[in-house]
Swiss-Prot record:
Domain OBG-type G: 159-329
Annotated protein name in UniProt: GTPase Obg
Annotated ranges, domain Obg: 1-158
Designated gene of the protein: obg
Organism: Staphylococcus aureus (strain COL)
Role played: An essential GTPase which binds GTP, GDP and possibly (p)ppGpp with moderate affinity, with high nucleotide exchange rates and a fairly low GTP hydrolysis rate. Plays a role in control of the cell cycle, stress response, ribosome biogenesis and in those bacteria that undergo differentiation, in morphogenesis control.
One of the record's GO cellular component terms: cytoplasm
Length: 430
């Protein structure tokens, strides 16, 4: 089964908790704090495996949860960091944040990695909070929660050549005779319902990857037929091979087929209009094909190369392969993925950090309570052990140092009013 789009849920591992402990040894009075830090939670990492050709593995498992870091231990022993969860994907996979539609990673090279959900930092043990004023702190920090998000995976096949055209024009037959690919071939429309890849070698030992895409019809760019599902795979081909049934056996005019398919390509992605193209006039073994070819050439002019072939008698197949290889040589220095990134703003950094941690907002609930939200304050809330009075006092100091107390006063918050953070309720005290 060919799967090229899927949505999955990711949960990176939480950091391990720091602990509150003290050094207790014979003959060592006032041993001091000895609580170790928690280990780092596992991140969710995507890695390219060139042996994969589909996203099928993600069809049956949609939820991925990475391991939690180990808790700290006494004697200042740190917890063990969790091992990252590595998910293998085929080359050409684009990862997007479902909520924002932001491109998080574009993975094209074997072994390339991207950290998509970052594991939480381990909480600090009480020995990390020792100061001259408080040499034996009696609180520690909980581990930071790992990132959690839904992402979509979209596969754009990395082929040098893309075969496009109406259904039943001979695309699958051509791929089957020039490579070892075994696409399904039948005398009915949409026999091909998934892309097929084949490695093609020319008689002079040049090679390239060719993709046979499901047949397009008018309106494909708007979702008609199967075309819209698979047009994305054309985006990364360096050369488009446009196959046309020159016999007109389906009752369509060859020149109209040519115009309709090009209109659909341009409507889907404007850049495809300028992609190098070779026209293949197929079924030249049938009556009327030569007359139609002459009229076709008169109509489109000499700018677009037209190569007459027959996939049944295999006439001119070698000439076609030479023409494709020559065209690829001509455009070998063109990086389609870079062109695409510049066009749509794809970001290929390994990890995109969340900006501006210190900002916060204050709003009011219907019952009059003040609601404080923001990355930094919510992170501190999650990492605070509210069963520990010293930890609660530290949290209050952090709120003051961030300016949240002053901001609440400016909004009219008075002594005894309710303040909420992530569902937790506090009483404002002057």
């Amino acid at each position: 089964m060919f799967v090229d789009q899927v949505k999955i849920s990711l949960k990176a591992g939480d950091g391990g908790n720091g602990i509150t402990a003290y050094r207790r040894e014979k003959y060592v009075p006032f041993g001091g704090p000895a609580g170790g830090d928690g280990g780092k939670g596992a991140s969710v990492v995507f890695e390219v495996d060139e042996g994969l050709r589909t996203l099928l593995d993600f069809r049956y498992q949609r939820h991925f949860k990475a391991s939690k870091g180990e808790n700290g231990q006494s004697s200042n022993m740190h917890g063990k960091n969790a091992e990252d969860l590595v998910l293998k994907v085929p080359p050409g996979t684009i990862i997007k944040n479902v909520e924002t539609d932001e491109v998080l990673a574009d993975l094209v090279e074997d072994g390339q990695r991207a950290v998509v959900a970052k594991g939480g930092r381990g909480g600090r043990g009480n020995s990390r909070f020792a100061t001259p004023r408080n040499p034996a702190p009696d609180f520690s920090e909980k581990g930071e929660p790992g990132e959690e998000l839904d992402v979509s995976l979209e596969l754009k096949l990395l082929a040098d050549v893309g075969l496009v055209g109406f259904p039943s024009v001979g695309k699958s037959t051509l791929l089957s005779i020039v490579s070892k690919a075994k696409p399904k071939i039948g005398a009915y429309h949409f026999t091909t319902i998934k892309p097929n890849l084949g490695v093609v070698s020319t008689p002079d030992q040049r090679s390239f990857v060719m993709a046979d895409l499901p047949g397009l019809i008018e309106g494909a760019s708007d979702g008609v037929g199967l075309g819209h599902q698979f047009l994305r795979h054309v985006e990364r081909t360096k050369v488009i091979v446009h196959m046309i049934d020159m016999s007109g056996s389906e009752g369509r005019e060859p020149i109209e087929d040519y115009k309709v398919i090009n209109q659909e390509l341009a409507a889907y992605e404007q850049r495809l209009e300028d992609r190098p193209q070779i026209v293949v006039a197929n079924k030249m073994d049938l009556p009327e094909s030569q007359d139609n070819l002459n009229l076709f050439k008169e109509e489109i002019g000499e700018d677009v190369p037209v190569i007459p072939v027959s996939t049944i008698t295999r006439d001119n197949i070698d000439q076609l392969l030479y023409a494709i290889a020559d065209k690829l040589e001509e455009y070998k220095d063109v990086d389609i993925t870079v062109e695409e990134e510049e066009s749509v703003g794809i970001n290929r950094v390994l990890y995109k950090h969340t900006p501006s941690q210190d900002k916060f907002t204050i709003s009011r609930d219907d019952d009059g309570a003040y609601v404080v939200s923001g990355n930094a304050i919510e992170r501190m809330f999650k990492m605070t052990d509210f069963n520990s009075d010293p930890a609660v006092r530290r949290f209050a100091r952090q709120m003051r140092s961030m300016g949240i107390d002053d901001a609440l006063r400016e909004r009219g918050c008075k002594n005894g009013d309710i303040v909420r953070i992530l569902g937790g309720e506090f009483e404002f005290v002057e």
